[in-house]
Amino acid sequence: MDEREPLDAPPHPAKTKDEVVRRAFAMRALVYRVELELQSQGSNFAENQVATSMVRETVVPALQENDLWDELTAFEQQTLTKPVGSWQPAELFSLSWLSESLSVLIWSLGILDELQPWDTMMDPSPVLTLFDLAGEDSGHWVSSVELRDAEEIADAQFAAEIWHWRGRTQAMLLGLIPFQAPQGQRADEFLGPILQYTAEEAEKSGILRRIDGDFPAYGQPYRNARDQQFHLLMSIASERHHALNWLVGFGLKWDDVSMDT
């Protein structure tokens, strides 16, 4: 992000309520499949076979009958139907964060009152029972919800962009992303003033409250985050940023969303 200027206007229209609801239902199936994969680590082969049959004979047909199958990306379709217990670690890691994106969609529909702080994972479990593909009550809540005001969603998108930018900047400082500071400066010498300015402006905008001139994370300055804490911060920001960019129109489909910061 250049001098904290917002991105250009989204190239596509913002998503409608119907589009958000459809994607949320499809993602619910994926989150359920993730739960089965996690449970499979303590299950035997026969139990995993039963779970696989249930996905293929119940979940997939329900998605198809409700015209939701094509709401999933090709990768999601392929991974959803793999035998339970067969996912590679990278697949499990990639899809295990979808509950964060799903929570953003649930929030955008007004079902969740607020998003969690940016160092805290969302817990969608209280409302996941709403997403029963075969449930008779699904139509009732779908007809009763409305998308939040466009300005409120845009504000959340900008906050996500800022937090994702902070994560990427931290990755540069940690040497996880290649970065060459100009004029022979060290990365921290060049990026430090930009970080301080950004944190100050973000505080003025009400996005955060600084700690020692930096973004707050786990009660400390963000720059202190390392290892698991840092990866958690990055994953939260990335998933929310993806969902919010999709909502406001930075991509027609879920898998072609621009994630520039």
Kindly label every feature range from the protein language model.
Residues M1-T261:
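Extended, charge-rich alpha-helical interface modules
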